[in-house]
């Protein structure tokens, strides 16, 4: 007898606890990908090899969030030092404000060729592999190729996102562009339902070509030619020259101290410093009440609004920024901003400092090496553009550009836009604690702040810190809170002037993972119930 049940609705919250390991650990939102990454460690690979294998698997297992056309960022703790990688691509040389205005655009389109930027993730993979990798590309890509060729069972959350993408692209794309997306991602005439099997031979072949060319084909080989040809024939801006000119870059992570801990993020063009600015503001305050206090939530929200207002005003391609990262992270400036927080909700305004669909994963090996890695096509599958015969779904990161010529983030040729994806890392006294991240667009800095405060201020264990109900600022005076706060929380916040919505769906509140390593080498991992993920441990 077959049971009849709904895999998209869960009446009772899952009871999760932290997971322990010693020799290796991988956390991500897809259990098959986590297991594949751990298998790489068991085969003799290190944390970077595992991160690359997991990231490759996620392109197949969660195509609703990332792909060959993604951007990526990473923080790597290796041999006692923290390294940062910015693998975000720039806009095509042909993408100018004037070209868009000539087509009648007053703001950046969300889908189609206009928001497509150079995919940076694969170049980032190569940078990581060249510097830290120990296994061959053939070995690293083996699990992803297997899932692409043999297929896998689509999970409930992913099936829901897949269906939403169909609706978005069918409405927004030309029939020609939508048909290429449909051929790969809905070959049976509908998107895969939960429990159905999806496979993609073209994904497997692209992985094989990347392995054979040391990931060069996407930028200076056959795959680059396929992208160029399709772009030219369908009205796109991206050319082989743009791809050949791009290379991911190593960067120095930036940090702030928060109550004795150092919280690390990638510097702009990403908005990780928004989380650091908010933590700087919060450090100016002391909290007698706990996480569920309306006073705490009010102050967190006001700090987040101030930090985000500054971030959205100033963060852009570093070559175009009008203030420095150091100015934005000044403790003196944070104290000035904190003094603006009162008992009532305030309309957010940026200050004047003195002269970010996504997947997140983290890995650790037995030698103490750890990786915080994030990769994204931005909105679901991205732009909706799928290059024929390759499985390459191109991102729509350019949607974050502004059309205002006075903005540092104004669209322009070979320019990096304001970026939402941010991998985090935590240290104390120069020693690694571990990687953490919360995927989910503009929720990401808000998630980072809440998870860090849950751990440091409210002394929650890692699983509690992820499980705890969250709030998010959605713009102007508007906020959303999850179910799980005290029943009178919404009313109390409304009395302070916040415009409050109690969300019925937790999908928009981020989906996080973390791994911490103690002084004895014990690994502690956690992943949250908002995602269908898992911790794979050894």
Language-model features: locations:
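Noncatalytic scaffold domains of N-terminal-nucleophile
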Residues: 1-35, 39, 47-214, 218-220, ...
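Internal maturation/activation junctions in enzymes
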Residues: 3-6, 284-377, 389-390, 397, ...
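Active-site rim segments in enzyme catalytic domains, especially the processed small/beta chain
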Residues: 60-77, 81-86, 237-239, 369-434, ...
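Short beta-strand scaffold segments in enzyme catalytic cores
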Residues: 66, 71-78, 359-364, 423-425, ...
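Short, small/polar residue-rich loop motifs at catalytic or cofactor-binding pockets
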Residues: 250, 355-358, 419-421
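Glycine-rich phosphate/pyrophosphate-binding beta-alpha loops
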Residues: 264-272, 358-362, 374-385, 438-445, ...
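Extended C-terminal subregions enriched in glycine
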Residues: 367, 415, 448, 457-507
């Amino acid at each position: 007898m077959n049971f009849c049940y709904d895999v998209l609705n869960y009446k009772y919250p899952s009871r999760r606890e932290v997971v322990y390991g010693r020799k290796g650990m991988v956390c991500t939102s897809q259990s098959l990908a986590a297991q594949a990454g751990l298998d790489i460690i068991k085969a003799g690979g290190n944390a970077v090899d595992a991160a690359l294998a997991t990231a490759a698997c996620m392109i197949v297992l969660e195509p609703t969030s990332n792909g060959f056309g993604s951007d990526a960022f990473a923080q790597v703790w290796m041999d006692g030092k923290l390294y940062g990688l910015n693998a975000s691509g720039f806009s095509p040389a042909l993408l100018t404000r004037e070209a868009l205005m000539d087509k009648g655009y007053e703001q950046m389109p969300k889908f189609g060729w206009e928001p497509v930027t150079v995919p940076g993730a694969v170049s980032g993979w190569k940078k990581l592999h060249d510097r830290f990798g120990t296994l061959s590309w053939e070995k690293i890509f083996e699990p992803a190729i297997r899932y692409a060729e043999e297929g896998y069972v689509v999970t409930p959350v992913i099936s829901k996102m897949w269906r939403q993408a169909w609706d978005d692209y069918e409405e927004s794309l030309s029939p020609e562009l939508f048909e290429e997306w449909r051929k790969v991602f809905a070959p049976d005439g509908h998107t895969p339902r939960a429990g159905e099997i999806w496979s993609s031979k073209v994904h497997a072949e692209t992985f094989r070509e990347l392995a054979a060319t040391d990931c060069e084909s996407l930028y200076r080989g056959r795959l680059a030619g396929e992208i160029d040809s399709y772009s030219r024939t369908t009205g796109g801006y991206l050319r082989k020259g743009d791809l050949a000119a791009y290379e991911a870059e190593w960067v120095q992570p930036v940090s702030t101290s928060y109550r004795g801990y150092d919280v690390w993020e990638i510097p702009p063009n990403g908005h990780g410093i928004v989380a650091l600015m908010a933590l700087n503001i919060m450090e100016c305050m002391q909290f007698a009440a706990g996480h569920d206090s309306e006073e705490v939530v009010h102050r967190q929200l006001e700090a987040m609004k101030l930090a985000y207002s500054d971030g959205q005003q100033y963060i852009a391609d570093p070559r175009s920024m009008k203030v420095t990262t150091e100015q934005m992270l000044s403790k003196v400036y944070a104290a000035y901003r904190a003094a603006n927080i009162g008992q009532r909700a305030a309309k957010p305004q940026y200050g004047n400092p003195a002269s970010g669909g996504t997947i997140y994963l983290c890995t650790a090996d037995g030698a103490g090496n750890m990786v915080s890695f994030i990769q994204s096509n931005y909105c679901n599958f991205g732009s909706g553009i799928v290059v024929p015969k390759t499985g390459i779904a191109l991102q729509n990161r350019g949607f974050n550009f502004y059309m205002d010529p006075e903005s540092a983030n104004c669209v322009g040729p070979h320019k990096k836009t304001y970026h939402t994806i941010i991998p985090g890392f935590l240290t104390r006294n120069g020693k690694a604690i571990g990687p953490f991240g919360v995927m989910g667009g503009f929720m990401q800095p808000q998630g980072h702040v809440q998870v860090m405060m849950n751990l440091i201020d409210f002394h929650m264990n890692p699983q509690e810190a992820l499980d705890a109900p969250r709030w998010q600022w959605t713009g102007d005076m508007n906020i959303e809170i999850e179910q799980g706060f005290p029943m009178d929380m919404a009313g109390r916040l409304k009395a302070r002037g916040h415009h409050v919505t109690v969300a019925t769906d937790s999908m928009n509140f981020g989906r996080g993972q973390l791994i911490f390593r103690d002084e004895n080498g014990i690994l502690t991992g956690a992943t949250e119930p908002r995602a269908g993920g898992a911790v794979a441990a050894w």
